Amino acid sequence: MDASAGGGGNSLPTAGADGAKRRVCYFYDAEVGNYYYGQGHPMKPHRIRMTHALLAHYGLLDQMQVLKPHPARDRDLCRFHADDYVAFLRSVTPETQQDQIRALKRFNVGEDCPVFDGLYSFCQTYAGGSVGGAVKLNHGHDIAINWAGGLHHAKKCEASGFCYVNDIVLAILELLKYHQRVLYVDIDIHHGDGVEEAFYTTDRVMTVSFHKFGDYFPGTGDIRDIGHSKGKYYSLNVPLDDGIDDESYQSLFKPIMGKVMEVFRPGAVVLQCGADSLSGDRLGCFNLSIRGHAECVRFMRSFNVPLLLLGGGGYTIRNVARCWCYETGVALGHELTDKMPPNEYFEYFGPDYTLHVAPSNMENKNTRQQLDDIRSRLLDNLSKLRHAPSVQFQERPPEAELPEQDEDQEDPDERHHADSDVEMDDVKPLDDSGRRSSIQNVRVKRESAETDAADQDGNRVAAENTKGTEPAADGVGSSKQTVPTDASAMAIDEPGSLKVEPDNSNKLQDQPSVHQKT
C-alpha cells in the first residue's frame, strides 16, 4: 500500500534515505491494556490501548504488519534473568505475597513495582513483543515496533522503577545472534541503567542514554561512567538538567549519534522512546515537544539500519499515546495531520483534539556552555574508538521460538479491566521520592575517561563481576544449555506453519558477559 494512503495525511518529504519507505511490523496484544498496577500508581499499561486506537483511526495499521506477540517463556526470560527471580515472578500473586515477604524484599518488589493480577503474563507479553521484534529484524524487516516494551530499569535479579523483566536486554541478545554489533539508544528521562549494566563490559553493545541527572531516579548515568574492560568507551551517558527544549536536545543528539554511527557501525539499533521526556509529563521535568522527541526517531531511521522501536516511561498518558502514534508515522515515512480523527478516547485529547501539544515556557537550565562541554567530552571519548570490534562467525544458536499471530481479528476491548482506564492523568501522582530513595544506596562503577591506570587489572575485575554468568550458546547470564529447535517451533513470517532451524547455520561467537554492579 502506498505510504500516503489512509487517514493520516501526506508522505514525509524525501530527504536521502529518511524519505524512503520501510518494511515495518508492529506488535500489539489487546490484553495489555487490562493490566493494572493499582490505584494511584503512575504506570498505566492502558496507554498502549490508547496508542493502538490512534494508530487505527489514523489508518496506520493498514500500512504495516500487525502481529500479536507470543508470550515469552521461562527459558526465554532466563537468558538474562536469574532462574529464582523468574520463578518468583511466575508464582507471586496479590493473595500470596504476604507469605513471601522475604522474597519481595530480596527481589525489590513492592511499592514502585507492586504485585498485581496477571503480573507474570504482563511480563511475558511485553518481553515477547520485543524479542519477536528482534527476530523480525533478523529476518529482513527494516523496523519493528513494540510500544509495550522498553522497561529499561529491570536487573538480572530484581525489579526496579516500574520494570520487572528487561525486555530490551533480551531483544539485544536476540539481535546479537545475527549482528556483530548492536547499538542501544535511550531517550527516556530516566537513565537506562538496567541495559547499561547488562552490557557494561562488552564492546559488542554500545549503550547511549540521554537523561535527567542529579537527585533523580535511578541516580546513575554520570558522564564519567564509560564502560569497563572490553566495554570501556562503549557506554555513553548524556546528563541533562531540567527544562531542556527541542533545540538544545538536538544540539547534542544529532552530533553524538552521528559520530556513534560512524565509529561503532552497528548492525542493528534499539531505540527506547520513553515519553516521560515530553513537556508536561507527570513525573518528568524536560520540555520536549512531540516533534522534538520524534526527531530522534527520524534521525536514527535515516541511517537505514534495522531499527527496533520500544516504549518506556510516560505518565501523562494522553500525550504518550500522541507521541507514539506520531512516531509510528515517522517510522512508516508518513506525516500525520494534526487534527485528530474521532476515536474511542477522543474526549481525553480535548480541548484542542490535536496530535501535537505546545511545550511550556519553563526555564531551560541547560546552558549553552554546559551543552558544549558535554558534546565535546563525549565526542572526544568516541574518538578513542579506533575501529569497530569484529567477531568471528561460527555456528549460530537457535533463535527464539516466539511465533506471532496476526492481530487483525482481535477484539481490543475483550476482557477489559474495569479500573485500567479510570485513573487517567488527573489523579495525583506518586512523587519521585520513593524512586529517589534508592539513589543514596546506588554504588556506581566509574572509570575516568582521562585515566587508564585501572586497565591493568581490568580483566580480573571483569572476570569477578561476571563469574557464574557466562553465557550458554543461546544467551547471556543463563546457566541453561541451548534449547534445540523442534517441530513445535512456529514460523515467524507465516503464523501457523512449522519451522525447524538447520544445524549448520552460522553463529556469532563471543556473546557478551553480563556485568553486575555491586
Curated annotation (Swiss-Prot):
It is found in: Nucleus. Its EC number is 3.5.1.98. GO terms for cellular component: nucleus. It catalyses: N(6)-acetyl-L-lysyl-[histone] + H2O = L-lysyl-[histone] + acetate. The active site is at H153 (proton donor/acceptor). Residues 22-333 are annotated as: Histone deacetylase. Residues 413-435 have a biased composition (Basic and acidic residues). Its cofactor is Zn(2+). InterPro entries: HDAC_PDAC (IPR050284), His_deacetylse (IPR000286), His_deacetylse_1 (IPR003084), His_deacetylse_dom (IPR023801), His_deacetylse_dom_sf (IPR037138), Ureohydrolase_dom_sf (IPR023696). It comes from the Eukaryota. Transmembrane segments: none annotated. The keyword Nucleus applies. Expressed in roots and leaves. Binds 1 zinc ion per subunit. Zn(2+) binds at D188, H190, D276. Residues 387-518 are annotated as: Disordered. Gene3D superfamilies: Histone deacetylase domain (3.40.800.20). Belongs to the histone deacetylase family. HD Type 1 subfamily. Interacts with TPR3. Responsible for the deacetylation of lysine residues on the N-terminal part of the core histones (H2A, H2B, H3 and H4). Histone deacetylation gives a tag for epigenetic repression and plays an important role in transcriptional regulation, cell cycle progression and developmental events. Histone deacetylases act via the formation of large multiprotein complexes. Negatively regulates the expression of the NAC48/NAC6 gene that controls root growth in seedlings. PANTHER family: HISTONE DEACETYLASE 19, HISTONE DEACETYLASE HDAC1-RELATED. Plants over-expressing HDAC1 exhibit increased growth rate and altered plant architecture. Plants silencing HDAC1 exhibit narrow leaves, reduced diameter of stems and reduced plant height. This is Histone deacetylase 1. It comes from Oryza sativa subsp. japonica.
